[in-house]
Every structure is written in C-alpha cells, then in structure tokens.
C-alpha cells in the first residue's frame, strides 16, 4: 500500500452515508410538498362544500385540479336534483290523479234477504221469520229461522216458504237481530227492496253503504242517474241473468234471493260505485229517495203473484179478506 493513500474500506462508508442522507432528505421534502398540496386541495374542496369529513387520508380520493370544475358542476346538479324530483315525481307530488271510484271489495260487501210472516190483526203486520246473508262470492254467512215477537197469524207459506215446523228450531228475534247486525255494520249491503228487510230488522243502515238492486235497470239504461225502478227480483234475474228464481209452490228462498241480488250488483258494480262517488258531492236535494224510508214499492203488484193481486180487490179500501186454503198460506194486504 502506498503511503498517504486512504484505505478504500474507510472511504466508502462515509460516501454511502452521505448519499443515504441526501436520499432521505429529498424523499422527505417530496412527501412534504405532496402533503402540502393535499392539504391545500382538501381545504379548497371543504371551503366549496364539495368534501365532507373523510374517514382518513388513505380513504379520501381527491380530484385533480383539472377535474375540479367538472366535480363542482356535477355536485351542483346533484344538489338541485332532489328539489326538482320533489315537485315533479308522482310519488311525492300532492296533485290529484284521476282514479276509479273505490269499490267495496269482497270482504266489505254482503247481500241480505228476509222472509216475513203476518202477525197482528188479520196478519197484516210483517215480522221477520227467516234471514239469509251471503258474501260477495256467494257463500252463505247466515241463514236462520227467527221467531217473531208477536204470535203468527199468517205464515204466508206460498211466498215466504215458512211453515209451523220451521218455528220449532227458530231463535228469538232479539238474538237474531244482534247476530245479523254484526254482519251488516261497516259493510256495503246489497239486496232487493232493502227498506223492507231493514224495517223487519228494526234497523237503519247508512245510505252510502246501501245498494238496492231496484236501481239496476236504471243504471244499465241511464248510467248518469240513480232512480228506483219498480220491477221484481224475479224479472231482473230472468232478463239480466237469464236464470229462473222463485219457481214452484214452496215459496221463496231467502238464500237464493240474496245470491241473485249480489249477482245483479256485480253486473253493474263499476258504474254504480262511480255514480255513488260522484253523487256524494251533489247537494242533498238533488239525491234520489232513500230506500230505507220508501214503503210504497214493497206492495207494488210486480212483487207478488198475479192471482194474489187480483184477489185483493181495492187495496185502498182497507185491504182484502184473507184467502182460504192450506194452513200457513194467505195473502198480505197493503198498508191502510
């Protein structure tokens, strides 16, 4: 080794350490500048309300300066979009949309028919002896014989189908009334000449929830009005449903009559409910008569066999004498 020459092993470590320090210093400066730019960009975005509190620097992706205007425009449109949607979207808008009239539906709709017998002087007072209630689909919900409060004078078997034997298993009127009203309350009640059934039940059903099938012919011919037509359930069933009811000599079946009334209602259900919805807004004086108070139609000759009406004579003179015949059969005279 030449004198004065520095050993190679001692010279290299010092150069290496210097280079390492420079590299670390330069990296630190580079990181500091990046951090400063990061913090400046973050502060700018927060000032423009484009950046909320982030979970951490590592999870926050910031746009480059060239992308910032586009982000700002997108954010502005994003903030304005809910306002436009709240005013125009159908789900949030309060503007009324034309809809069909609400329909009662199967659960809220029942049909009823009652059969009456004669009590009081000459059997001229009608009292409930059988009641049947069917559902919208025609299922029998109630069908029981009922013992009148007064002694029966005329069973009216030819039309009511009630005989003395039926009264052996009949239930008291008060019991039947409670059971039936539980089925009717809160529901749309369908029936033919319903004022007679409600009168026998000693009950007044809300007019808005009453569908009397005596209106059906008028709905089919003039959907814009509701005027009761004096036509029998038997004729309506034959002409509109093409079915025969109330045939034979065993009297009417309240179950059959209730089912027929429901079928007639379903025939014009849509038009009827639309008419009811529109008439609800009309003044009270423009509405038709209430089916719960009209008693004249009950004794109209179209509701009873011709031989009965012919034998009654002049109804306005106090009514006819009771027909002779089998026990339990007789004619019902008109009210004085």
From Swiss-Prot:
Biased composition (Low complexity): 56-65
Location of the protein in the cell: Nucleus; Nucleus, Nucleolus
Pfam entry (one): RNase_T
GO molecular function: DNA exonuclease activity; exonuclease activity; nucleic acid binding
Motif (Nucleolar localization signal) on chain: 25-33
Residue ranges of the region described as Disordered: 1-37, 56-102, 276-336
Family matches, as SMART domains: EXOIII
Gene Ontology CC annotations of this record: nuclear membrane; nucleolus; nucleoplasm
Boundaries of every Exonuclease domain copy: 109-265
Family annotation (SUPFAM superfamilies): Ribonuclease H-like
Assigned keywords, A-Z: Apoptosis, DNA damage, Exonuclease, Hydrolase, Nuclease, Nucleus
Motif annotated as Nuclear localization signal, chain positions: 164-187
GO BP annotations listed: intrinsic apoptotic signaling pathway in response to DNA damage by p53 class mediator; response to ionizing radiation
Membrane recorded as keyword: no
Polar residues biased stretches: 8-20
EC numbers on record: 3.1.-.-
Transcription recorded as keyword: no
Highest rank taxon of the organism: Eukaryota
Extent of Basic residues compositional bias: 24-37
Job of this protein: Exonuclease with activity against single- and double-stranded DNA and RNA. Mediates p53-induced apoptosis. When induced by p53 following DNA damage, digests double-stranded DNA to form single-stranded DNA and amplifies DNA damage signals, leading to enhancement of apoptosis.
Name of the molecule in the record: Apoptosis-enhancing nuclease
């Amino acid at each position: 080794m030449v004198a004065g020459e520095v050993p190679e092993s001692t010279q290299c470590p010092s150069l290496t350490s210097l280079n390492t320090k420079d590299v670390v210093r330069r990296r630190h400066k580079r990181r500091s500048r990046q951090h400063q730019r990061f913090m400046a960009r973050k502060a700018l975005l927060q000032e423009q309300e484009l950046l909320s509190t982030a979970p951490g620097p590592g999870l926050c992706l910031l746009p480059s300066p060239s992308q910032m205007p586009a982000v700002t425009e997108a954010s502005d449109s994003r903030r304005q979009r809910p306002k436009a949607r709240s005013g125009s979207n159908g789900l949030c808008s309060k503007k009324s949309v034309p809809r069909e009239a609400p329909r009662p539906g199967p659960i809220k709709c029942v049909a009823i028919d009652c059969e009456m017998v004669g009590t009081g002087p000459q059997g001229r007072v009608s009292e409930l002896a059988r009641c049947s209630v069917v559902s919208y689909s025609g299922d029998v919900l109630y069908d029981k014989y009922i013992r009148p409060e007064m002694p029966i004078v005329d069973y009216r078997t030819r039309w009511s189908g009630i005989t003395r034997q039926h009264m052996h298993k009949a239930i008291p009127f008060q019991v039947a009334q409670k059971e039936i009203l539980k089925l009717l309350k809160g529901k749309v009640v369908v029936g033919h000449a319903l004022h007679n059934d409600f009168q026998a039940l000693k009950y007044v059903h809300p007019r808005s929830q009453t569908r009397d099938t005596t209106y059906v012919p008028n709905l089919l011919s003039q959907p814009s009005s509701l005027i009761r037509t004096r036509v029998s359930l038997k004729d309506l069933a034959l002409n509109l449903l093409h079915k025969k009811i109330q045939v034979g000599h065993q009297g009417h079946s309240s179950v059959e009559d209730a089912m027929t009334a429901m079928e007639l209602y379903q025939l014009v259900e849509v038009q009827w409910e639309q008419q009811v919805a529109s008439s609800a807004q009309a003044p009270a004086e423009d509405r038709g008569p209430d089916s719960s108070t009209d008693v004249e139609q009950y004794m109209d000759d179209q509701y009873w066999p011709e031989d009965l009406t012919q034998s009654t004579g002049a109804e306005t003179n106090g009514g006819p004498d009771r027909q002779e015949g089998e026990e339990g059969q007789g004619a019902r005279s008109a009210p004085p």
